[in-house]
Structure formats: C-alpha cells, structure tokens
C-alpha cells in the first residue's frame, strides 16, 4: 500500500474512532467510557485484526502528533482569560503543585525501593505524571526506558481522567482552582482535556498545574537520583 494512502487511512481511523467514542460517552455518561481509552482500544483492535504494525500506524499517527503539538498553543487562551485570578493565587498554585509532585515521588520511589527495584526501573516510573514531551527526555537522560515511560505516562493520564471526577466528588472539591490543579498535576494533558470539559477556569488552572509539574519534576528527579544513587 502506498505510504500516503496508509497515512491517510490511519488518520481517518483515529478521527472516526475518537468521534464515535466521544458520541458514546455523551449518550452514556460514564467515566469509564473515556473517549481516549475507547478510541485507543479500538485502534489496537483494528491494527491486530489487519496485521498493521506500530510503524505502519505511525505513518498517519505522526501527523496527528504534529497537529496536537501545535494545538497546545490554544491552552494560552484560558490562561490569558483567567490571568487575574492566577496572579492572585500564585503562592497557592506553586505550593499545591510542589506538594503533589513530592507526594508522587515519595509514593513511586519508596514503593519501588521497598520491593528492591533497580535505579533503571525507578527512573522509568518517576516521570509518569509529567507530560510526555518532558517525561520521555527526563527518563532517557537518566538511563530509564523511555518507551516504558511513555506507557506509564499514558496509563497515568487515562486513570486520572477516568477516576478524577469521582475522587473530586468524594473529596467535595468545588473550587475550580482545586479541580484544575488536581487534574493537571496528576494526569497532565489527559487531565487538562477533562478539566476543559468542566469549565474554562478549571482548564486554565489544569494547564498551569501540568506545566509547573513538568518544570518542577524535571529539576527534582535528577536531584533525587543523584542523592540516592
């Protein structure tokens, strides 16, 4: 099959499956009917049925990645619209994100250390709550397995976006700041997309949470590894 035709088919497959997954969730509101999860499972099923390799899919998937990278710029709009509220809560935002990052590190590091896992495994898992573009680089530079890091980043994002709404209701969080920072800090881009579905203010704070988590983590992870290894 011509490469251009295959690329176009893979793009169409992705868009169509995501569209129907989104419609399914709208018709049957359920956090487990997450469009990203359903579409991903659908793509995997189609690739297995037709014997299409990952590289074959990425002939079209890489174009989608380029488009998604450009759409990140759109996150500037909710930030700009809520700039005054952001300015008024700078200390709360920073303290909340830093606390979230440290708790994540403690959970991952101490658990893996207790079970005797090696430095490579720890480095691979530590960036799981960072957005992929940064997390992959952090893992790669410190000797982790970046392909596995991607898997854990995606899994973390999906779990956060699926269970986040239930946990927020359970904790009775009503503030857009709290909801947004929780999503951005715990489940990066997946969480930010979910926060934007709630309201633009939550989306703005989720964007900040995602960015700050990536920056703080990329600084602290190397420090943690140097201290203990």
From Swiss-Prot:
Q: Name one GO cellular component term.
A: plasma membrane
Family matches, as InterPro entries: CidB/LrgB
Location comes to: Cell membrane
UniProt keyword annotations, A-Z: Cell membrane, Cytolysis, Membrane, Transmembrane, Transmembrane helix
- Bilayer topology annotation: Multi-pass membrane protein
Q: Does the keyword Endoplasmic reticulum apply?
A: no
| Transmembrane feature ranges | 4-21, 30-52, 62-80, 89-111, 147-169, 204-226
- Where would you say this protein principally sits, based on its record? membrane
What Pfam families is this protein classified in?
Answer: LrgB
State any GO BP term from the record.
killing of cells of another organism
Q: What is the superkingdom listed in this entry's lineage?
A: Bacteria
Looking at the keywords, is ATP-binding present? no
Q: What does this protein do?
A: Increases the activity of extracellular murein hydrolases possibly by mediating their export via hole formation. Inhibited by the antiholin-like proteins LrgAB. In an unstressed cell, the LrgAB products probably inhibit the function of the CidAB proteins. When a cell is stressed by the addition of antibiotics or by other factors in the environment, the CidAB proteins possibly oligomerize within the bacterial cell membrane, creating lesions that disrupt the proton motive force, which in turn results in loss of cell viability.
Question: What is the similarity comment for this entry?
Answer: Belongs to the CidB/LrgB family. CidB subfamily.
The record's PANTHER family line, in alphabetical order, gives: HOLIN-LIKE PROTEIN CIDB, PUTATIVE SEROTONIN TRANSPORTER
- UniProt protein name: Holin-like protein CidB
The organism of origin for this protein: Staphylococcus aureus (strain MRSA252)
User: What gene is this protein a product of?
Assistant: cidB
